[in-house]
Amino acid sequence: VVLVQSPLRLSEDSEPEPDLMVLKPPLDRYREKLPTPEDVLLLVEVADTSLEFDREAKLPLYAEAGIPEVWLVNLKENLLEVYRDPRGGRYREIRLLSPEEEVSPTLLPEVSLRWA
C-alpha cells in the first residue's frame, strides 16, 4: 500500500505528512484510521528547502517512533540519504547514495530501485 502526503499518527499530538509511505496491506485498514508507525514499511521525504527541517525535526521523531527505514531524497546535493535501524531516538545506519546506485528497502529486499 502506497500513500502520498497522507498523515501518519505518531502520537496524540503529532501527525506529520510524509511525502510517501509504503504501508502494510490491506488498504481498507486505513480508511477508518490513520496509519501508525507499526504500519510503515518505508517512509520517504523529498527535500529541497525543507532539508534541514526534515533532518533535524522529522528524522528524530520517526526514529523515536520506530519507523524502520526512512529515505530522504536530498535534492540540494542530488543524493538519497537512507536511514535505518532506529534506536534511542536516532538512526544507527546512514547511507548516502548517488543517482546511479541501486537501493532495496530493508523490509522489501526483493525490490531493487535506481532512485534518480
Q: What residues fall within each predicted segment?
A:
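C-terminal interaction segment
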Residues: 3-65, 72-116
